[in-house]
């Protein structure tokens, strides 16, 4: 059985040590639950006896309006990790590329479909930034590339021009580029840095976002 690797397992900590932890294992908002979310949860309690819409139609329409993209481009899941595993299962890549260091869930998900994971190592002399060197790592044998934007755990952000160049390189070799933007909205200029401007130009681009951030 696969062991839990994602952070936030406060229940397991409590069971083992008998007290609640100060949990820094998952990068969630320190500001707590937004008031609007609490009100929406309270308002929906009357219909809690029903199964939710499996296609998340209303949610997708709201997200589409907020993000400025068609609703049919959106797929909702139980967190970004759920969608990372779904992507690996849907694509079943033979070989994938990730940076190192980066979010460990990519390699874990790829391992469930026996995918060979190649790592593009980020260098200390470059302050662990993603540079143009990553383009050479995307060879014709690569089926899927994960790019964390900004990267977890380094916090480094790849230049938008480099992200576009990486997408074009992926297209050239037939690979899918998955850009994880779960932390991008923490940046004041996050929306302007998003790769979503490229969605209308390519069928090889997937963008991940998450509510927990």
Language model regions located:
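Short glycine-rich anion-binding loops that position phosphate/pyrophosphate groups of nucleotides
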Residues: 27-30, 80-81, 103, 149-153, ...
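PLP-dependent aminotransferase-like
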Residues: 89-147
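Short loop-beta-helix segment that forms the pyridoxal 5′-phosphate
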Residues: 52, 64-86
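Short hydrophobic alpha-helical segments of the AMP-binding
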Residues: 63, 110, 170
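Glycine/small-residue-rich loop that forms an oxyanion/phosphate-binding "nest" at active or ligand-binding sites
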Residues: 79-89, 93, 179-183, 187-188
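Conserved beta-strand elements of the Class I
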Residues: 22, 75, 95-97
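Active-site pre-lysine segment of PLP-dependent enzymes
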Residues: 128-141, 153-177, 181-212
